[in-house]
A protein has these predicted regions:
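Solvent-exposed soluble domains appended to multi-pass membrane proteins
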Residues: 1-318
């Protein structure tokens, strides 16, 4: 991530193992916000559509209990993946969808990441002074499809040895996201209020988009080894703060652990579940639909039982 190459101070970077590729953003959201894992749920399931039907403990509800204002943002239809119904059940006070993004700019018909940054800053500046905020933003700019129908993208990115319009468009959009992240960090570097920014991908694009990369290696998406296939479920993540935090590079994690890692890095008191997750990470460093190596172990079974309780049986009592 170019915008962070000069910002090693107070930064943690690494790769996040997620349970989806090419789509189903909601499942990565679910893992990050709840600390639960898709590895324990049926293949093809979407918790936002099938399992979250009542108040469900999450990072948002926990931070709300600590006095935080909690905001969710997604610059598209509010009903997508049932977000308008799910976010309140996860403890968000407010949800801003596309109709709340006034005066936004667009890329390929989607509200762009720069406008998302503007909305984050606007929300931060309007919140109650002295009250901390948790702002969860799911961007839309880089959503598929990627075609050669849009010729107005600035700073076209190509890969030597390939002639793929899809790949070029995708990488150009990622470059624009990098610029938006830099804009966000530049703003909060100037703020006195302690702030942590966590930036991560929801999933990689479809096989068709990255096929030219494999072709350069003499391979195809259809003949990848198990290890190579797992690479298709990795996305970058960054934790940055405008105050002193421990620094780390090239870390490996999975989406269910990232929320607890963020809280620990920020110096925010952890919930009992988050403390549990960080202990579990020592025994199971990675867990996702693609990382089930610990299946059947005591650590796996204990985690699975606790997740079932929190997702299906929890009644709001501590």
């Amino acid at each position: 991530i170019h915008s962070l190459q000069q910002r090693a101070e107070n930064t943690q970077t690494g790769y996040l193992n997620v349970s989806v590729k090419g789509g189903n953003t909601a499942n990565t959201e679910f893992e990050f916000l709840t600390g639960d894992t898709m590895a324990f749920l049926p293949a093809g399931s979407i918790p936002y559509q099938q399992y979250i039907t009542k108040d469900t403990p999450s990072m948002a509800s926990y931070l709300k209990s600590l006095g935080y204002e909690t905001y969710a943002m997604h610059p598209y239809y509010a009903s997508g993946w049932n977000r308008d119904k799910i976010y309140p059940l996860l403890g968000f006070d407010s949800f801003y969808s596309s109709t709340d993004f006034y005066g936004s700019t667009y890329e390929r018909g989607y509200i762009d990441d720069s406008s998302c940054v503007d909305k984050i800053i606007e929300t931060y500046e309007k919140k109650d002074a002295g009250t901390p905020a948790f702002i969860f933003n799911v961007t839309m700019q880089n959503h598929s499809p990627y075609t050669d129908g849009y010729q107005n993208l600035q700073g076209n990115v190509t890969v030597d040895g390939t002639v793929s319009a899809q790949l070029s468009e995708y990488l150009t959009l990622v470059k624009l996201s990098d610029a938006a992240l830099e804009k966000l960090i530049d703003y909060f570097e100037t703020q006195d209020e302690p702030t942590v920014i966590v930036f991560f991908g929801d999933h990689q694009p479809t096989d068709a988009v990255v096929e030219p990369i494999w072709n350069l290696e003499g391979k195809s998406s259809s003949d990848l080894t198990e290890e190579e296939n797992q690479l298709r479920y990795k996305v970058p993540y960054v934790i940055w703060a405008n105050y002193d935090i421990d620094e780390a590079v090239n870390q490996e994690s999975s989406a269910n652990y990232l929320g607890a890692q963020m809280m620990e890095a920020a110096g925010i008191p952890l919930s009992d579940y988050q403390n549990y997750l960080l202990e579990q990470k020592k025994e199971m460093p990675l867990i996702s639909t693609q990382h089930t190596e610990a299946e059947g172990s005591d650590a796996w079974l204990n985690y699975q039982t606790l997740q079932y309780y929190l997702l299906f049986d929890w009644d709001g009592e501590k």
